[in-house]
């Protein structure tokens, strides 16, 4: 009896190098402009070529401006990184979706929507949120620049074998409770180091009921729980999403692929090293209050008191977060005012996210105290949203409608918070300075962010009108 992780691992195992270290084969290598330049330079210096350019795909996302596609207006360092990626890809025969390509977008949005992500694959990228692709039953994880070079040169990677963790979420979610709330509740329960050394498999009826886009949200934040990767077993929802995409198998190959993919599920009776259980009906809309994704409470909660900490380390963490976030213990989450809203990122920038946010703000107006932006995850998402009129709903409400990119998720482009700004964000990290020096980030789902933009503070989306 084997877990899904064990099946994928064994199918890609090249050999054991020494005690605890293994060489595994990589099926798909995704690259972007920030973590690849030094890797390509290393290849040149060593006189090596890219081993499998056809298995490598690139896009520009981290540094891309969502305001303009005029590279002359970009930050000089960002412009150099984007130009370098294009040059490196052209020289090595790698397909690149640059900032002028209509299908450009965040790497973890465009790869699945193009059918590049399949069950049973190994997928790596020089980006920690590569775990997103685990929603398809692929073993996907982030790697460092030296490892990017190794994969480019050999199509293999040296790894230690992870332990297995089962996270079960059974039952039915309450209305307006989303995948973002599930993963924040999980991180709140086990902590940001709770899954260190593990690959998580998300299981249970509540997980099986999720759409593919919602599953991607769950797996996206596996890294925030400390995990190496996150997996969800492939099923008909998975197959229906992949079918007909640009790079998905066609005809007879499709039937053979689905037959193979159905193998990548955990066998009944297989043992996990650890199991964590949550009940879906107990999960409420969640809001982070601090500077770690684990510092999270329900919308009906309050900012915690350091005196209630379980240990001295947690106490210091709470005290530090309270100071940085300029909050007081006992303060109601619903009383926290915000002045910025960001709907986007590889966590929540897909069409379902934008539909939910647009439905929330339709016919309403953004608070005069708030600047709110919506950043589609890809050119395809943007075009689909515009075909459905979502852009008009957002702009009529007072939101800014932008071009695709990582945007305000991280302070590496021209979408940044100013010191003292407080942002309701659908992204995945709320560390100090993550969205800009001195900026304060509260992680929420798309509908919660949209409602906060209208009211100027957090509200319970379940009974908000």
From Swiss-Prot:
Please tell me whether the keyword Acyltransferase is annotated for this protein.
no
- Reaction(s) catalysed by this chain's protein: (2R,3S)-3-isopropylmalate = (2S)-2-isopropylmalate
Q: Name one GO biological process term.
A: L-leucine biosynthetic process
Any idea which UniProt keywords this protein has?
4Fe-4S, Amino-acid biosynthesis, Branched-chain amino acid biosynthesis, Iron, Iron-sulfur, Leucine biosynthesis, Lyase, Metal-binding
- Reading the lineage from the top rank, the first entry is Bacteria
Q: Where are its TM segments located?
A: none
| Positions bound to [4Fe-4S] cluster | 346, 406, 409
Pathways involved: Amino-acid biosynthesis; L-leucine biosynthesis; L-leucine from 3-methyl-2-oxobutanoate: step 2/4
What CDD domains does this protein's entry cite? IPMI
Q: What does this protein do?
A: Catalyzes the isomerization between 2-isopropylmalate and 3-isopropylmalate, via the formation of 2-isopropylmaleate.
Stated name of the protein: 3-isopropylmalate dehydratase large subunit
Q: Which organism is it from?
A: Leptospira interrogans serogroup Icterohaemorrhagiae serovar Lai (strain 56601)
